[in-house]
Amino acid sequence: MIKIRFTHRLLPVLLLALCAFAPRGFTQTPPTFSQVVVFGDSLSDDGNIRHLLEDQYFISYPGGDYNYSDGRFTNSSDTDPSSDLYAGTWHEQLERDFLGLPVATNSLDGGTDYAFGGATTADGTSSRTVISNPTPFGGGQLSVDVDNMGKQVQDYFDDRTPDPAALYILWGGGNDLFDDHSASHVTETATNVAELVKTLARAGARSILVPNVPPLGVVPHYKDDPETAAALNAASATYRGELNTDLDAAVATLSGEGITITLYRLDVYGLFYRLAANPEDYGFTNISDSAQGQPVDPDQYLFWDDLHPTTAGHHQIAAAAFDLLSGTAPAPAQALNISSRLDVGTGEDVLIDGLIITGSGAKKVIVRGLGPS
């Protein structure tokens, strides 16, 4: 079977899949929202990219012909191997299984999920190239323009009146850093997200969920490229800090304008290391390889392809988001009780949470019990 690949990594790393908190031993009171509105990339796209490709090229991708769940960059009961436990992306599982709300379907078919695989946090559109074309095209390249998150928000305003009782999700940044992980671009990406928070709030949004990104270099795609993996991990860590700072400033600015919002910050970066330290606690036996097309149980794998999580991974993100919304997630300043080995980068001096590691070679460290997170 010929596969389609996007040269600019459709998913910000799906790696996200990883985030999760330990099993719950207490009663949680779910928050009440009227609906969920989603802006993002392939981690949250449940049909917009497929809609575009069907319209322009008569290709149902992602879909069953390419061993993906229908319209989603993950697995399902009809993929090889099939999932027996979970269905849908993280926000679909959050809405359906945790919040008891209707699922936000893709916006091009009339729903409130405006996410597009390949989207960045910028305005306008991004041109993504599809290669290894299937029959009957027989080679060459296909391009598709996807709505970036700034345009997604504007399209939402054009379509609907903002609902103050809704939960708004803004999850991007992965594709931005995949495209360019320079320090200046990391700063620009964090600024973009904070500006979108202010834009939504000024229009009437009052509950906004903003995840950061996991260490992007841990996805299977970079297993054999340690230098790029280390650079992406470093950029992800920097983004985590800069996003927090920019969100603090955004909330302060809005408060000065008389606008009060509830801002939920999902620390996917920190959540990954909790999962990596004890994957078996979350039902995983493999958190480094892709399950797609392999004779394995995908419900025990974190990754479906070389970038995106399985529905089991998506489930852990949904569970972590619900803990956050319910006020039962670990406090951000709580120490991470973990032990994890990772590459942190190259260069004469590498900064790791306030420590400078000297030397010009690649640094490998074992992180134990870091705090605060």
Indicate where each model-derived feature is located.
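Basic side chains
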Residues: 9, 72, 206, 363-364, ...
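Conserved active-site regions of diverse hydrolases
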Residues: 19, 26-330
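Bacterial N-terminal signal peptides that target proteins for export
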Residues: 2-12
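Intrinsically disordered, low-complexity segments enriched in polar/charged residues with Gly/Pro
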Residues: 7, 293-294, 342-343
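Bacterial N-terminal signal peptides
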Residues: 11-21
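A sequence-level detector for low-complexity, Ser/Thr- and acidic-rich stretches
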Residues: 198, 209-211, 219, 320, ...
